[in-house]
């Protein structure tokens, strides 16, 4: 990536609809796509699943970056997501997520500020904004809950 743009390649791998995708920056990290039987063989992510995972990864990266910038030491972080599908056209109409954060000396106000900043700074969130309803929440894990997530 030399000018801020991204390049990727997607290649058909069988006689159905299994594909492998790579990016120019990660040519050795293959992402497999497929679809449900009988159209596919269920040997990879479906497109909307991968979109949900991509959204979650981008949002998580932004959240953790912001928390560390605030001087927080993160013991545990988990983001659970749910995508609500619509028909005609098939797409995600709503993404709901809940972040569970285990960090010392973090307040509810700091969590709320981090959520607002994440919405502004997350590239994938910005990409879906206006097309997909996003409802996000975050909560602080107790010390006991942190131990369960290790």
Regions found by a protein language model. Name each.
Residues 61:
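Short glycine/serine/threonine-rich phosphate/pyrophosphate-binding segments
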């Amino acid at each position: 990536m030399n000018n801020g743009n991204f390049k990727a390649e997607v290649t058909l791998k069988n006689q159905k609809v299994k594909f492998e995708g790579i990016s120019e920056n990660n040519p050795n990290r293959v992402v497999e796509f497929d679809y449900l039987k009988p159209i596919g063989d269920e040997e990879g992510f479906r497109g909307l699943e991968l979109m949900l995972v991509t959204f979650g990864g981008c949002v998580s990266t932004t959240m953790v970056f912001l928390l560390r910038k605030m001087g927080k030491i993160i013991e545990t972080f988990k983001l659970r997501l749910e995508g609500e599908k619509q028909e005609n056209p098939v797409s995600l109409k709503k993404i709901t997520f809940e972040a569970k954060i285990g960090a010392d000396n973090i307040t509810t106000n700091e969590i709320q500020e981090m959520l607002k900043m994440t919405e502004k700074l997350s590239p994938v969130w910005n990409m879906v904004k206006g097309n997909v309803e996003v409802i996000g929440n975050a909560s602080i894990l107790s010390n006991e809950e942190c131990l369960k997530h290790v």
